[in-house]
């Protein structure tokens, strides 16, 4: 007779272990689980632990050839979500041996691979991950980080200013370069390729890189400030992407860009390593994130994607604005902004942070606020994001009635006025509009911008909200 009992057994017998004490080296995950009717939460939580680690649907004889106790994921706690019917937070601990060192790709393949198609669950969302220091240390992380970036750019004590060049598609390379030059000479620190600008028939990448480099060196010479343009190196293959990054380095520009979710984590980590080795900053766009993170009960929360990016590598990442046209509730946004910038972040459920995270000196990432923001938002943005951030005004620069350069001037004046007021001890949350109005008196460009955008509001409730306490 065979030495094991065939047949199907309940997951919870093996994978639900409420008495388990988590180890410092475990990767911990918090899943929001919605079981199918009739499936008990312990079975659902155990099923998640099993399917994302060593389990399969039946007992197999090869189980006897290894030590499941050493390698299995364990569901060690389950809590009911207040105010939601049939939703639970299942906490799962994974032994570190299950993951390849330095590979975000492998980590996600395990933790959020097959398990999301699992029939016993109606829906499943990964809310947070605790990455243990032992695993963090196998990653290079951001190519440079916040302090090195400030030193490279020689810009201190204020947020950085950016602008996405619009119309995003259709401009020729020369006209695109003109738009870049006007924005940079007006006072912005950066301009940006839109995420879907790669290498299209109307503007091939090499032409764009050349004209943008010319624009930024010209603006640099005129203003005496270091300028940058995020040259989007995203391409159809890793080799092509690196070829574009090499060309950017040869031109002597300071920064390139990547769409990390559509490009993929393997490509992103490859580019991040190249950028560190060659002194390029790396701006990260999160195109496609809402496909993954927008549903409250299914998918992956953006704070997990943000943590993954810090491990994979990037110096800037888009993180919502709290005040503009794109998703972002204040407490939640600030929660993952801290996870991007700080070295040590305490568990804080009021901000959606399920685990204490120690980054053990991995460089930080600058959050980028972008999307539907304009000069009237400047006090709120300065207040919410603080100095270590990039504020990006696309339409809020190029939509200025007098053109790009005056639009850039308006934004720079508004920013400098807000920073000055804050440093003098004024409360931007209360006096913000007053600060902007005062600045209008000596900046006609700002006054014109304030007139254009005084009525614009994007009034929609955020989809991503915290559970009732």
From Swiss-Prot:
Q: Which CDD domains match?
A: RuBisCO_large_I (cd08212)
Note on cofactor: Binds 1 Mg(2+) ion per subunit.
Per UniProt, substrate binds at 114, 164, 168, 286, 318, 370
The cofactor named in the record is: Mg(2+)
Entry keyword set: Calvin cycle, Carbon dioxide fixation, Chloroplast, Disulfide bond, Lyase, Magnesium, Metal-binding, Methylation, Monooxygenase, Oxidoreductase, Photorespiration, Photosynthesis, Plastid
Family to which the UniProt record says this protein belongs:
Belongs to the RuBisCO large chain family. Type I subfamily.
Entry protein name = Ribulose bisphosphate carboxylase large chain
Give the gene symbol. Answer: rbcL
């Amino acid at each position: 007779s065979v030495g094991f009992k065939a047949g199907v057994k309940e997951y919870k017998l093996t994978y639900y272990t409420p008495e388990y004490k988590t180890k410092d080296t475990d990767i911990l995950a918090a899943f929001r689980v919605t079981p199918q009717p009739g499936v008990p939460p312990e079975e659902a939580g155990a099923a998640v632990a099993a399917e994302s680690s060593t389990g399969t649907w039946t007992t197999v004889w090869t189980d006897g050839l290894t030590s499941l106790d050493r390698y299995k994921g364990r569901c060690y706690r389950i809590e009911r979500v207040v105010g939601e019917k049939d939703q639970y937070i299942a906490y799962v601990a994974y032994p570190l041996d299950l993951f390849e060192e330095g590979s975000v790709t492998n980590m996600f393949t395990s933790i959020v691979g097959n398990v999301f198609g699992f029939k016993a669950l109606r829906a499943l969302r990964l809310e947070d991950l605790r990455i243990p220091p032992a695993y963090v240390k196998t990653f290079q992380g951001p190519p440079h980080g916040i302090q090195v970036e400030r030193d490279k750019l020689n810009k201190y004590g204020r947020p950085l200013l950016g602008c996405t060049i619009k119309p995003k598609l259709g401009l020729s390379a020369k006209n695109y370069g003109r738009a870049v030059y006007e924005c940079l000479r007006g006072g912005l620190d950066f301009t940006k390729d839109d995420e879907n600008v790669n290498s299209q028939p109307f503007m091939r990448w090499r032409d764009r890189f050349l004209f943008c480099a010319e624009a930024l060196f010209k603006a640099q010479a005129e203003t005496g400030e270091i300028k940058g343009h995020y040259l989007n190196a995203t391409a159809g293959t890793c080799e092509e992407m690196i070829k574009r990054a090499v060309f950017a380095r040869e031109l002597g520009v300071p920064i390139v860009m990547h769409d990390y979710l559509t490009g993929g984590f393997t490509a992103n980590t490859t580019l991040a390593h190249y950028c560190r080795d060659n002194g390029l900053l790396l701006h990260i766009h999160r195109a496609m994130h809402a496909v993954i993170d927008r549903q409250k009960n299914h998918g992956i929360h953006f704070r997990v994607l943000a943590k993954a990016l810090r491990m994979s590598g990037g110096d800037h990442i888009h993180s919502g604005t709290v005040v503009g046209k794109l998703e972002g509730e204040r407490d939640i946004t600030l929660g993952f902004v801290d996870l991007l910038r700080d070295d040590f972040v305490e568990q804080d459920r009021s901000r959606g942070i399920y685990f204490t995270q120690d980054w053990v000196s991995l460089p930080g990432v600058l959050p980028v606020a972008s999307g539907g923001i304009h000069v009237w938002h400047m006090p709120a943005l300065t207040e919410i994001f603080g100095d270590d951030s990039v504020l990006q005004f696309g339409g809020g620069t190029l939509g200025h009635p007098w053109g790009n350069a005056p639009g850039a001037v308006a934004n720079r004046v508004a920013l400098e006025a807000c920073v000055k007021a804050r440093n003098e001890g004024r409360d931007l949350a209360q006096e913000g509009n007053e600060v902007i109005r005062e600045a209008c008196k000596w900046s006609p460009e700002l006054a014109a911008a304030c007139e254009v955008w005084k009525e614009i509001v994007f009034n929609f409730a955020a989809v991503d909200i915290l559970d009732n306490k």
